[in-house]
């Protein structure tokens, strides 16, 4: 390990943790109406009854927590996908998991009138799981291992089909379209803490699982044959990773809708900062992705008081950064 990488690693984690704290604080302070820090602190004291305190507790706190949960989930899911598929352009939408969750939620609303948070979460998990199983079955090869190329192709094909069906159902059913149009655009506008409580435990378990897979992912990134020679159980690692992706993507999609680009970009930035070792890149991704998502949400609230969707802002932020990272990597000969 070079000295520059060691120094970067020593700075990256505490620096990103501080950045995440700043993003969280600004998310509570800044919006269509900026509030002083004293009002935010008073709101958390439990004694404030003013309208400003209501804004903090009922509007900004839920969306801030949603950004933290969804950002962490999407970042880890993207990092897992890029390693499992050995495809640097993989993201949470590539394997069709987000599309499966979205399709299930829209289908449940159209056929059964599901509208509560619990019902939508259940449909999201079911859709994500079914999509993952279909892709895993289609992308499997001899010995029960997953072929990265077949896995990627199966995911792209399934995502295209499900996204088309989702749009068709929503457009043909005006009630469903009105109910889910903001969610389909990708937004942190969450007003119910109960929804976040329901997905908190699954996200924490899946996130911890992803972090515990760090060593196995390091071996797998060298190739299946090399990983097997090093004593890694490739099929088990791929299966556990796929299940973690299912839970992370299903939870994030159920909370904030389909948000692209975040899971694609941030793992690249993490590897650029601290190297390809998953023991470092996964924690850095876990800290950096929620921070970026919160900053994107803040920018959307400031630019357009009527709420420019975070998915739009994240795409504008993410595209130039990713292009820079790709060009830098190309010049370095990697």
Curated annotation (Swiss-Prot):
Residues 1-9, 85-92, 142-151, 214-241, 301-305 are periplasmic. Signal peptide: none annotated. It is a multi-pass membrane protein. Residues 31-63, 114-120, 173-192, 263-279, 327-334 are cytoplasmic. CDD domains: TM_ABC_iron-siderophores_like. GO terms for biological process: ferric-enterobactin import into cell; iron import into cell; siderophore-dependent iron import into cell. The chain crosses the membrane at residues 10-30, 64-84, 93-113, 121-141, 152-172, 193-213, 242-262, 280-300, 306-326. Part of the ABC transporter complex FepBDGC involved in ferric enterobactin uptake. Responsible for the translocation of the substrate across the membrane. This is Ferric enterobactin transport system permease protein FepD.
